[in-house]
Amino acid sequence: DTYDNEGNFNYYTAQLYAGLFFTKDSVCGENNIVNGHEFSTKGLSGIEKHEEQLRMLFFNPGKKINGLPFISNKTSIFDESMADKYDMNIDFKDYNSIPCYVFTVKVKKGKENDVVINEMTTWFNSKTFEIVARNYSLSYDAGFYDFKVDMEVQMTKVGDLLVPDVLRYNGNWKAIFKKRERGVFTATLSDFVRHG
């Protein structure tokens, strides 16, 4: 049921997941380092565009993501036009025994229909200010499509690189003329090797 007769995914959620984390062919000359990388959807279409938009949301949250019908401006939560819709808080707590500053952005009561990012919590290592983990809660109903997604990302150090260690996704979405898709997964990434 996951694949059609030609080996393609029947589900868009599975196709996006596979496109983000797996490759069908060997990949040469790519370092996969996102630090300093400028994400852009320019010249992209279809699934490639949507994969890049997801990368933008994962690695550069709070920025405007072009090309998302009705919600592009609603992802830029730190812009003046959106910031008044949120309560922002800084706290200090341990995360997996690491002392962290915890930055939480949560939608204000009554503003839920004006936003896409309902809540985002980021744990920063108190000594290095590197991201230790981030949780996202997203939802929107545009009439012809809707979604509700919760994601968790845990980071780890591999040498001098900060890389995702655990990714959790629990969500559902519906687009006009398509069946509702629900997905729950946990991706545990390991055995990182740096070449070159």
PLM region spans:
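Structured extracytoplasmic
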Residues: 1-116, 140, 181-196
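Non-globular disordered terminal and juxtamembrane segments underlying protein topogenesis/assembly
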Residues: 122-124
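Acidic, serine/threonine-rich low-complexity disordered tracts
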Residues: 92-98, 112, 118, 127-195
